[in-house]
Amino acid sequence: IIGVSSIYEGVLYGIDLGLISEIKDEIILNVYKSSSDSETISISTSTIMFTSVDRSENTVWVLELAKINNDSNITYKPDPEKPMSILRFGLPENFVDLLIDSDLIGVEFVTIDKGFGILGNIYPGEHQLLFTYGINYFETALNFTRKTQFELNNLRIISENSIDLYLNDFDYSSEVT
C-alpha cells in the first residue's frame, strides 16, 4: 500500500493510494491553513440512545453518535499552550466503562473528570464520533444532564422499550463543559 503525506503548519495530512503498479494520474493532497479558533466547529447532530438497564448493577447503558462539523477551509488545531482548547464532551456524573471510536484521523482521546477530550486536529468537513458508557444510579430514577462546548443543531433521543423516558421541561442550553 502506498500513501502520500505532508506536514503543513504542524498538521499531518495524508492520502492512501492503495496498491499501485503504475501511477499515471496526478495525485492531489489537500492541505489547509490551521487555527486554534473553534468558532467554525459545531455538532450538526447528536443522537443519544439509552440502550439498556442493568438493574442488578444499577447501571444505565448509553450509546451516543455525534457528527462534528468544521464548516471552514481551516483545520482546527488546539493551542498547545491552552489545554482547555481541546474539543471536550461532557458526560453525566458517575459514568463508567467509556469506549470511543471515530473517523477522525490521528487523534487520541483522554478521559477528564467530567467526560473526555479529543487530542488532535479537526479537519474541514463532517466527522463522526461514536461513544458508549454506563451511568451508575443510586435512586429509582436517573437525572440525565449534559452540557455542550459547541453549538448543537439537532438532537435525537432514543430509548429502549424497558426504559421509561420523561422529558419534563426539556430545555437545551449551550454551556462550556
Give the location of each predicted region.
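Lumenal/extracellular ectodomains and adaptor appendage modules
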Residues: I1-T177
